[in-house]
Design a protein with these regions (language model features):
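Transition-metal
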Residues: 1-133
Length: 133
């Protein structure tokens, strides 16, 4: 039987010039004062940005520790790239156009020592006449 339970994580906030403050209103996030927050990383196991468990007996442990110590309970027999949790889940709050982003295919990303990135978006809120392209 698994020793895991429903986990919550401390968000990792990212200041962005195109960000805003709507994550407070929409999700009750307690944002750092007086800066535009463009991203709230909800689950991350990226070097330098690893989510920390916020609740229960494992509070204070990070997601990478969880993957190393409870891999099967957490992920079953899923294959891991570089031994890290396979998803980066974040909320974006963009009040301006986002900076240009280029996501190369996996082969090119590996050549450049980067990560491939397949994205899925869900639009939770938008102002009238907002655009996505």
């Amino acid at each position: 039987m698994s020793s895991l339970y429903p986990l919550t994580f401390q968000p990792i906030f990212k200041e962005r010039v195109w960000g805003a403050r709507n994550l407070e209103r929409l999700y009750g996030k307690k944002l750092p004062a007086a800066v535009p927050i463009g991203e709230s990383w909800e689950i991350s196991d990226r070097p330098g940005d690893v989510s920390v468990i916020a609740n229960g007996p494992l509070a204070g442990k990070d997601l990478h520790w969880l993957v190393e110590n409870h891999r099967v309970d957490l992920l079953g027999d899923a294959k891991l790239e570089a031994g890290r949790f396979p998803l980066l889940i974040k909320l974006l709050d963009a009040q301006e156009k986002l900076s240009l982003q280029v996501h190369p295919p996996a082969s090119k990303a590996a050549e450049l020592r980067g990560d491939p990135k397949t994205e899925m978006w869900f639009i939770a809120d938008a102002i009238p006449n907002a655009e996505l392209y």
